[in-house]
């Protein structure tokens, strides 16, 4: 069985960039991803949504970000295994065995970039929700904005996703109604300002009451007041429930189910590192840009701590390519 320098579990944005950086440092690397398509949430949940907080990219869609990361990754030697679910990670005599539902691979180091785990959307909580979702009346994320062209759309939620999608839907939908059960939104101030100064109809503090055919009824919180308007589609942005899977015995996790990391992004198991939304430490910020830095930090740390059978590369990227 071939022994690699590094196995990365998770092919989201942080995992893809981590693989590129590891290859740039001269590590032999493989990435294992349970989904059939790489790219994580940006690719699979919101490929057309614009992302604004990545350095050097004024705005990029989830699909284009994934495309760019894969093009970057293609510059180095690597192996990408899709559709394989990691079952367990074991360490014996300083070497990790990563077992999936299809095979077992060995490596000196492991980097977990599994994100928030398996995601299930939080739902409205109404009796007919599954039927309405199957009919396409209710959605939890958008894979194609064309589905909403010329439609009357109601967006439920008060965070960044609800705000961002409302702004994007405004460009294609006939009308956009943003419904939040509180008076204040939880998103970035600049995004809230953009929504308030747009043509989006904001309804706060309201919650879902009833839907008959295309007639949506909202109920005002702590009031008998109600509001009715015609609607074609509903987008629910109440966030996601996560199902983090502990892959290694004795791996320390925080209360929120994420892997505890030290200042070098190493877990309590020597040689097993973590980066991105899967990690937790004091002051942790769940941002993609932070995850990229965590991946670099973890790989640089393991190159100093672990023993490799070949010399590693250093220096700036401009001197390597």
PLM segments and residue spans:
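Rossmann-like NAD(P)H-binding beta-loop-alpha module
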Residues: 36, 149-172
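FAD-site-proximal beta/loop scaffold in flavoenzymes
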Residues: 127-149, 233, 237-289, 297-301
